[in-house]
Amino acid sequence: MFVGVADMTPQQLFSGDAKALELFFTSRIPRLFAILLAGAGLSIAGLVMQQISQNRFAAPSTTGTIECAMLGYVMSVVFFGDGDHLWLVFGISVLGTLTFVHFIQRIQFKSVVFVPLVGIIFGNVIESMTTFIAYKYDALQSLSAWSVANFANILRGDFELLYIAVPMVILSYLFAARISAVGIGKDFAVNLGLNYQQVVTIGVLLVSIMSASVVMIVGQLPFLGLIVPNLVSHFYGDNLKKNIPLTAMYGAILVLGCDLVSRLIIFPHEMPISIVISILGGVVFIAMLLRGKQHA
């Protein structure tokens, strides 16, 4: 909270300095809350996605969820003149994610590493469609703001949509047992008396709403929903109910750490946080792919 271009010290806050207090409550606190909510929400979205798709390489950034949210945003801008129609963003995000989940469930890949590769191709197709529509209807400037995540412009009144991650995380925790059963397999879930398709749909709704809300406010945070759940599972096991709060905590810590790096690495200028996360996430993702290939 005390790292930034504008100087602010704890002494100024405690002494009641008007400018320091305004900066603290208008910019620094909202930015901190946005970082924590985005990190926790997107990490939980990745954890739930990996369960319902039965693949540890699945995540909002490798299944087309984020690209579908971007398509919904551009369509909202084109048809309604602004991107405030959240129902369209969430709806297209849910539809695209459900399509991908059904696709990978119907086709049994010989290796788990094919799922994220197919997901990235699917996401690229959606992104190409989105870019074409944005070019055609002069909405490219609105779209480009989403391509690079940055917390620098987060102010009070700009980030409150991220609070939707809180009830979504709670619902994920409440449905953890059912989602875990679905993650084992359809036959197992049905034998337990669960409505398999209903649980999958609920999981996709949770993933899409959390992912879309983060992307709309912050932008794309690549690989976050992939690496955090996998690292938590590696060190703490596969108990979904136990891993949900751990994943939320470590996701928030990771984004906070990357944000500090992005602020300090070229200080007093600021690097977009998506660049830092992309470098870190890309290295971890490649390591996971190589490890998965060795154990395939």
Range-by-range predicted roles:
Residues 1-296:
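Alpha-helical transmembrane segments in inner-membrane proteins
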